[in-house]
């Protein structure tokens, strides 16, 4: 595996490989890689002749400078994981490489980007779309892989691809969890042992809510989750929404949509964790 730091060098490598007829898969990441990322990389390796994994902590998607400063940076360990997964290239550019000038582009995909994360993290999805579009332009992948844990992000990127007419396939990949159910996240590294134990209440509550939902209304299920998280030690609920999986708009009845997802964000101590669960899926 090669580690590449400039767009020019990456494009030179990819041009030669495309001339051999190879398809290119892209896995955008911010590093601090774990088994969830590995599942995306392995999927790409299985479906493409060449896999590029970007490792870049994108400053424009952080609306909290403290969160940006604390985000784990572990490039050497990341490269070892990527090599083990069969990636061809780790693309680890500098901020100056990706943003030689400030990016003033405004991306708006309302109502997808105005609810949930969009409401609580203003500017976040604009930053996500800035960097993802830059990566798409630099790599020109045939397929790009994103995890379903960032459910809203995946929906917004699909819409960006549709509106900007990118000629690529977006592949959503299932959430990867620890054996005890905790959704894998780079931020889990910041949890103390006690906080990690408390964080288990998030996934456990979501799993219970899926069973609960089979015999209760949407509003009853919403209340059950909110009360369970509020009663759990060391957790502070930011939001829990039960939404249409395509439009991300709230549903009031299970009959409102064939695709219904519960999306949650919880603070465990100072660490902000997200998760989701599918109640109905086509």
UniProtKB/Swiss-Prot annotation:
InterPro entries to which the protein is assigned, alphabetical: Pantoate_ligase, Pantoate_ligase_C, Rossmann-like_a/b/a_fold
Binding site for beta-alanine: 61
UniProt GO BP: pantothenate biosynthetic process
Residues reported to bind (R)-pantoate: 61, 153
Reactions that this protein is recorded to catalyse: (R)-pantoate + beta-alanine + ATP = (R)-pantothenate + AMP + diphosphate + H(+)
Keyword Disulfide bond attributed: no
Active-site feature positions: 37 (proton donor)
Family matches, as SUPFAM superfamilies: Nucleotidylyl transferase (SSF52374)
One cellular component term from this protein's GO annotations in UniProt: cytosol
Keywords linked to the UniProt accession: ATP-binding, Cytoplasm, Ligase, Nucleotide-binding, Pantothenate biosynthesis
Top-level lineage group: Bacteria
Claim: Ligase is one of the keywords in the record: yes
Enzyme class: ligase
Chain residues that bind ATP: 30-37, 147-150, 176, 184-187
EC id: 6.3.2.1
Location(s), subcellular: Cytoplasm
Main location: cytoplasm
Assembly behavior: Homodimer.
Extra remark beyond the main annotation: The reaction proceeds by a bi uni uni bi ping pong mechanism.
Listed PANTHER family: CYTIDYLATE KINASE/PANTOATE-BETA-ALANINE LIGASE (PTHR21299), PANTOATE--BETA-ALANINE LIGASE (PTHR21299:SF1)
Family, as annotated: Belongs to the pantothenate synthetase family.
Protein name: Pantothenate synthetase
Species the sequence originates in: Bacteroides thetaiotaomicron (strain ATCC 29148 / DSM 2079 / JCM 5827 / CCUG 10774 / NCTC 10582 / VPI-5482 / E50)
Gene that encodes it: panC
